[in-house]
Amino acid sequence: MTTISDLPYDLLPEILSRLPTKSIPKLKTTCKKWYALFKDPKFVEKKLGKAARETVFLMNHEVNSISVDIHGIPKGYSVSMDFTGTLTIPEGSDLEIFRIHHCNGLFLCATMNCRLVVWNPCTGQITWIIPRTRYDSDDIYALGCGDDKSSSLHSYKILRCCDDNQKKPVSEIYDFSSSSWRVLDGVTANCFIECNGVALKESAYWYASDKRETPKGKFILRFDFATERFARLCLPLNFQRDRDNKSVVVSVVGEEKLALLQQFDHRVHGLKYSKIKIWVTDTKIGEGKDLSWSNILVEELADDNLPSVTSFLLDEEKKVAVCSDAVCSDTDTEDEDRRRIYIVGEGVDEFVYDEVSTETSHNWPFLVSYVPNLVHIEKDAPIVEV
């Protein structure tokens, strides 16, 4: 009797490419032909275009898979959110994840005990990254790729911005093709990076400001993983540079655009409100040397509704943002530690998740939208204490 593993090899890519991406790793041990196919860069690249987008929420050092549904915009809307599972790093149940950096379905995770691991949540594969010098919780990281949507891990790189032993800023690159770090001579950000970065195409982006602390010295900072250089890009023309911002956050819209959220306080007839503005880049990233922006959303909220946005995901068509926020516990005011998810947009203003904790958490909640990827991660590097 003929079984599926006996099918001609040239038929397998078409058949298996129709399966959900997350189910494929469970099948790779079926036979040698299948295992070889799942490591084939052409097959991996084909699956990248078919996998459904997923959302995860970093909260209390755990990565949770969530589903957010929004219907009936702008009138008669209904919103709901479900936790669909917890993603666990293999052999890492005791790990406390401090930050997540995402690129093409791969996660770079910094832990509370200053370790660094690259993780493919789709395949479950990981590799620990040995430091050149001891990691610090203040280090800035980004995961990127010199080739857009590359199907080979060897094309990926890690950027680390840190201080050397003399407290001077240093930028260094971990190159997966050589499994080693190297210092970028004369290349530093030379600014304050004020939010978690995002990866798009071959670059990483942050909201940043000059160390001179002047209103004009605020910009989008880009690091190009192909050229390994920083560049400063413009903010929206009507960005409130002179405001005392509660938060400014960068996000990605699909696979082609950046979004920027600014949250600040203002008063109307003596009452304090929190205003949110969201912009989206007009053109696809990479089509111009600088950025041009369009303001697509302005919302005014009661001040206690959204204390401090830590991340957001934008539905540009519906003009709705899914935001995470945090309230740190305060013994003086008896405020409790809270982690929340909030929907804001045209005709929408609602919490879908609100967790209260008596214990203070030291990591900000963070939302990530990603497409599962079959990029193969080689065996773990040994863990070395530095």
From Swiss-Prot:
InterPro entries from the UniProt entry: F-box-assoc_dom_typ1, F-box-assoc_interact_dom, F-box-like_dom_sf, F-box_dom, SCF_F-box_component
Annotated CDD domains: F-box_AtFBW1-like (cd22157)
Alphabetically ordered keywords of this record: Kelch repeat, Repeat
Kelch repeats by residue range: 155-203, 340-386
UniProt key word Repeat: yes
Every F-box domain range: 1-48
Gene3D superfamilies in the cross-refs: 1.20.1280.50
Entry-linked Pfam families: F-box, FBA_1
Keyword set includes Repeat: yes
NCBIfam families, A to Z: F_box_assoc_1 (TIGR01640)
The name this protein goes by in its record: Putative F-box/kelch-repeat protein At3g17280
Natural source organism: Arabidopsis thaliana (Mouse-ear cress)
